[in-house]
Swiss-Prot record:
Motif (Q motif): 57-85
PROSITE patterns, per the entry: DEAD_ATP_HELICASE, HELICASE_ATP_BIND_1, HELICASE_CTER, Q_MOTIF
Source organism: Neurospora crassa (strain ATCC 24698 / 74-OR23-1A / CBS 708.71 / DSM 1257 / FGSC 987)
Catalysed reactions listed for this entry: ATP + H2O = ADP + phosphate + H(+)
Name of this chain's protein: ATP-dependent RNA helicase dbp-4
Keyword Chaperone: no
Gene3D superfamilies per the UniProt record, alphabetical: P-loop containing nucleotide triphosphate hydrolases
Subunit: Interacts with the U3 and U14 snoRNAs. Associates with pre-ribosomal complexes.
Binding locations of ATP: A101, R102, T103, G104, S105, G106, K107, T108
Sequence similarity: Belongs to the DEAD box helicase family. DDX10/DBP4 subfamily.
Length: 823
């Protein structure tokens, strides 16, 4: 066979495939070799980098890998800020960092760039597990960090995830094992570390805490301590915040190794941005809402954030101002909202040109809203650090912004000292009298018309008073000098809610306290930093149905009035005076809250009272477990008694039975029975008469309606086809347009209308004459009573047909046409 035959061509193709495989393998080897060389060169540049060099002005001056550099260029990040110039070189060298810088100074990139570089130099893949963990105190800030990470890391092959509350725990757990970088909130992350099987953090390379002072605060202390226990000691830790803590106890909890303290603005004249104009207004507590309303009405073409101390206040002011329509779009944001709603509101405010956002401190830290013109603080912040974070939502990235703080006269002196200590200078301004407008009457009208709004106003009042009462800084917050009656009146409330005070705890601890008891069993994180406890018992559909709650704002208030809200809301414990408590529920609460042990100190069995007469002996562990379930304790309770009330309001049992002696005093049983039968027969006879009269009246009305209907039908038949009717301009009564013509005398009749009226009373066979008919005696009628048409006559060469009646249907018109066509 020739060399060019099939066999030769097959051998040639096989050789080409082998050469192609060899080229690919060689190409991979060369590519791997180049990557190793690039990594060695990059590491060499990092080792030679001087962190204190003043020549670092752009990201291109830093020793960064190509994927990170290209991602920064594509996101239009070119020039380094002060905190980035100081922190990134140290982080690239692997040192722990404790960073503090002004709000809006670019701290997010200061830790995201080192995270990407650390994993890139380690050649991290999805099989290596979690490499970097970024913790944020709020969901909004976590979402923002994740979006920035996606932008600058678009050219990397790392997998990144966002783990926050408000989403399905099961769906997150399925994907968690494949993540290289996680952005999370403390509570949800700890929940995954405790519950998600196969989630391994032993290879963690870097831990980042944004707004670290807030994360290490009292509310997150347990979550952070438990979370750090799961993490390896050999990791790099970065802490960033606008107000950083240097306490040794905080740093020891996080196991920092010789941290570098980076504070680029520590020696600056002010702790707030240079372009921020800061003012404060001294306004009494009852006039705060009036001042806020006047401010919004004069700044309709602005983007405004209004901070308040509690979510109840945010909801009340938003609902009331929305009904009054100030002329600017209104939004509200607080920690009790669902995650989907919070994201939607955040996006709407971000994209809006002019808008006003009422918010709590959930957006006070780190969240970047573009082009915010004003930051208004209606309530005095708890400390100067909170003030700095709040005003930092405007004047970001060297732009300009303005901030206004409302202070009660009792708060002015003390809080200005706190601001001066933090290098914050604010100027006092006065409100023009023509800009003030009292809205107390409008709020009172709204509260009167809407019970929902009234009860929401009561909740807002209680939450504000509670926040002031629990403040630690008594030099600033002087509770006794506040005009609470005037404040309640300014909210539109009919009176001042009664509040019972008890000795409070630390305000931050209560503010960030876990609400696991309120929402246990849910797989979503109810608020930032809280720890959820999952129910172990099986919940049937009947249990779920019994646990359903009305979502109306009145529901919790009503439950509290009934004493059924003991564990519903930790925020309001011991602050609303309970006017009425159900005995059974109180007994169940007392039984459920008794001592853990089932025996008394003397060894006797413990007896728990479940009411006035019912008792439960705790003589076993099974009986002791009953105390934890109100549902199981119900069968040991006394049976309820149904009562009826007489006309005087006195309660009586529904079936009030006599004893034997009282019954015998009334006489013989047979006579009593006969009297009862006779009395009932009399009642039946009286009722029978009324029923017969009613039936007779209904039959009479039915006959009258039938007769009226028949008369109407007869009148319609006599009238024939409908004639057009004229309506007088000043009357609704129809008038016959031909009535005037009928009243005129007919030619040749002498104006006598007596004959015409007599003709109207002719037998039914003969129809009444019309206005155009002549009074001829020779009129002929057909069998059906209709006048016959006379023969046609010739007048002046024209054919004329005389009609005895006006055509009133199609049959008459056809007969007239046939007569005209005859010769």
């Amino acid at each position: 066979m020739a060399p060019g035959g099939p066999k030769g061509r097959g051998g040639k193709g096989k050789a080409e495939k082998e050469r192609s495989k060899a080229n690919k393998a060689e190409h991979k080897t060369l590519k791997r070799k180049r990557e190793l060389e690039n990594l060695e060169a990059l590491q060499k540049r990092i080792d030679e980098l001087d962190p204190k060099s003043t020549e670092l002005n752009k990201f291109s001056d830093l020793p960064l890998c190509e994927p990170t550099a290209s991602g920064l260029r594509a996101s239009h990040f070119e020039v380094l800020t002060d905190v980035q110039r100081a922190a990134i070189p140290l982080a690239l060298k692997g040192q722990d960092i404790l960073g503090a810088a002004r709000t809006g100074s670019g701290k997010t990139l200061a830790f995201l760039v080192p995270v990407l570089e650390k994993l890139y130099r380690a050649r991290w893949t999805e099989y290596d597990g979690l490499g970097a963990l970024i913790i944020s105190p709020t969901r909004e800030l976590a979402v923002q960090i994740f979006e920035v990470l996606r932008k600058i890391g678009r050219n990397h092959s790392f997998s990144a995830g966002l783990v926050i509350g408000g989403k399905s725990l099961k769906e997150e757990a399925e994907r968690l094992g494949r993540m290289n970088i996680l952005v999370c909130t403390p509570g949800r992350m700890l929940q995954h570390l405790d519950q998600t099987a196969g989630f391994d953090v032993d290879n963690l390379q870097m831990l980042v805490l944004d707004e670290a002072d807030r994360i290490m605060d009292m509310g997150f202390q347990q979550a952070v301590d438990a979370l750090v226990e799961h993490l390896p000691k050999s990791r790099q830790t970065l802490l960033f915040s606008a107000t950083q803590s240097k306490r040794v106890s905080d740093l020891a909890r996080l196991s920092l190794k010789d941290p570098e303290y980076v504070s680029v603005h520590e020696a600056a004249a002010s702790a707030t941005p240079v372009g921020l104009q800061q003012h404060y207004i001294v306004t009494p507590l009852p006039e705060k809402l009036d001042t806020l309303w006047g401010f919004l009405r004069t700044n309709l073409k602005s983007k405004i954030i209004v901070f308040m101390s509690s979510g109840k206040q945010v909801r009340f002011v938003y609902e009331s101002f929305k009904r009054m329509q100030p002329g600017i779009p209104l939004l509200h944001l607080h920690g009790r909202q669902k995650q989907i709603a919070r994201l939607e509101i955040t996006n709407r405010f971000t994209s809006a040109k002019y808008s006003c956002l009422f918010a709590t401190d959930v957006v006070a830290r780190g969240v970047d809203f573009p082009a915010v013109d004003w930051v208004i603080q209606v309530d005095c912040p708890e400390d100067a650090d909170t003030y700095i974070h709040r005003v930092g939502r405007t004047a970001r990235y060297e732009s300009k912004g303005r901030a206004v703080l409302f202070l009660d006269p009792s708060e002015e002196e003390g809080f200005l000292k706190r601001l001066e200590h933090k290098k914050v200078t604010v100027q006092k301004v006065n409100v023009k009298e023509n800009k003030k407008k009292s809205i107390k009457n409008e709020l009172q009208s709204q509260c009167f018309q809407s019970p929902d709004l009234k009860y929401l106003g009561q909740k807002a009042f209680v939450s504000y008073v509670r926040s002031i009462y629990l403040q630690k800084d008594k030099e600033v917050f002087k509770f006794d000098k506040l005009d609470l009656d005037g404040f309640a009146s300014s909210l539109g409330l009919p009176g001042t809610p009664q509040i019972r005070y008890q000795k409070g705890e630390d305000v931050k601890k209560l503010k960030n306290a876990s609400r696991a008891a309120m929402s246990s069993g849910s797989d979503t994180e109810g608020s930032d930093g809280e720890i959820r406890k999952k129910k172990k018992e099986v919940r049937t559909k009947y249990d779920k149905m019994a646990e359903r709650q009305n979502q109306d704002v009145l529901s919790t208030h009503y439950r509290k009035l009934l004493g059924e809200d003991q564990a519903e809301d930790n925020e309001e414990d011991d602050f609303l005076s309970v006017k009425r408590v159900l005995d059974d529920d109180a007994a169940l609460d007392d039984a459920a809250g008794n001592a853990k042990s089932g025996t008394n100190p003397d060894g006797t069995a413990k007896v728990v009272k479940l009411g006035k007469n019912a008792e439960l002996v705790i003589d076993s562990h099974r009986r002791e477990k009953l105390l934890k379930s109100k549902k199981k304790l119900l069968k040991y309770m006394e049976k309820g008694q149904k009562l009826v009330f007489d006309d005087e309001g006195n309660a009586h049992p529904l079936y009030q039975l006599q004893d034997e002696e009282d019954f015998q005093k009334e006489g013989d049983a047979k006579e009593l029975r006969q009297k009862f039968v006779e009395s009932e027969a009399t009642k039946v006879k009286e009722q029978d008469v009324e029923d017969k009269l009613l039936a007779k009246q209904r039959r009479k009305e039915k006959r009258e309606r039938a007769k009226a209907r028949e008369r109407g039908e007869e009148v319609e038949r006599e009238k024939g086809p409908l004639q057009p009717a004229l309506l007088d301009a000043h009357s609704d009564v129809e008038e016959d347009p031909l009535a005037l013509l009928r009243s005129l005398p007919v030619a040749g009749k002498g104006g006598d209308s007596g004959d015409e009226s007599e003709d109207d009373r002719e037998p039914p066979k003969k129809k009444a004459k019309k206005w155009f008919q002549k009074d001829d005696s020779d009129t002929e009628y057909s069998d059906d009573g209709r006048p016959r048409r006379k023969k046609a006559k010739m007048e002046g060469g024209r054919k004329v047909i005389e009609m005895d009646h006006e055509p009133d249907n199609l049959q008459d018109l056809e007969a007239l046409a046939a007569g005209l066509l005859e010769d």
